[in-house]
Design a protein with these regions (language model features):
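Extended interfacial segments that mediate partner engagement and assembly in macromolecular machines
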Residues: 27, 75-142
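Conserved, well-folded catalytic cores of nucleic-acid-processing
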Residues: 15, 19, 37, 52-55, ...
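Core recognition of P-loop NTPase motor domains used across DNA-transaction enzymes
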Residues: 11, 41-49, 60, 72-73, ...
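Solvent-exposed alpha-helical segments within well-ordered globular domains of core cellular machineries
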Residues: 10-14, 28-32, 43, 47, ...
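Catalytic cores of large soluble enzymes that bind and process phosphate-bearing ligands
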Residues: 1-4, 37, 41, 117-121, ...
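Cys/His-rich Zn2+-binding cysteine-cluster or related metal-binding knuckle/ribbon modules and their
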Residues: 2-9, 18, 26-93
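Long C-terminal interaction/binding lobes of large macromolecular proteins
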Residues: 102-103, 130-202
Length: 202
């Protein structure tokens, strides 16, 4: 069936099917829905995709997604620069910010250590984190990685690394209100608020 599509339609379907969670059938449905849209509406989507790829970058300090560098959180004078919460992905920052409780800053690892997938510590933003801590303003690191095998393993690795390089820094972990194997980005904001306020020393 797909072999009868024009080349431009087939290209669109192929590109849509590359997106996570979108199979060939879903890509076909989306492609034909776009074809039904007015040119103005379809081009508005194209403009939004172009804008996000040209304007969004990683903050040079915390590696969160931002349109300015450093990001708004990093330059906010009301934020406690001595309190750094380590998370896996930018989506986790949004989840923790939704609580309205956390007043520190963040460091986004952009992943977790996954030896089986050949994701090593050097592939994450761990060395920039160590450089940040070496600056002398950080007094507490909160491990906000997900309560998964990989998230816990990454947190343990970081704890040991911090103990070796910066033993003066207190290392804590979000309280275990989150179910094992869950993701911070999907957690209820009340659960996240409790996890922040009830954090425990590692």
């Amino acid at each position: 069936m797909s072999g009868s599509y024009t080349q431009s339609v087939q290209n669109l379907i192929d590109e849509l099917a590359r997106l996570p969670g979108i199979g060939l059938r879903s890509a076909e449905r989306i492609a034909f829905d776009l074809l039904k849209q007015t040119p103005e509406r379809a081009l508005k989507l194209a403009d939004a995709i172009r804008d996000v790829k040209t304007r969004i970058r990683h903050c040079s300090v915390c590696f969160n997604l931002t349109e300015q560098d450093p990001c708004e959180i990093c330059v906010d004078p009301a934020r406690d620069q001595g309190l750094v919460c380590i998370v896996e992905q930018p989506k986790d920052v949004l989840a923790l910010e939704s609580t309205g409780l956390y007043k520190g800053v963040y460091h986004v690892l952009l992943g977790v250590i996954r030896p089986l997938d050949d994701v090593q510590p050097a592939d994450l933003t761990i060395e920039p984190l160590m450089a940040r801590v070496a600056g002398g303003t950080v007094r507490e690191i909160i491990m906000g990685t997900n309560p998964t095998m990989e998230g816990d393993g990454t947190a343990l690795y970081l704890q040991q690394l911090l103990a070796q390089r910066h033993p003066q820094v207190q290392v804590t972990r979000l309280a275990r209100g989150l179910p094992a194997g869950s993701s911070i980005e999907y957690a209820n904001r009340n659960i996240l608020a409790d996890a922040i306020s009830g954090r425990q020393r590692m």
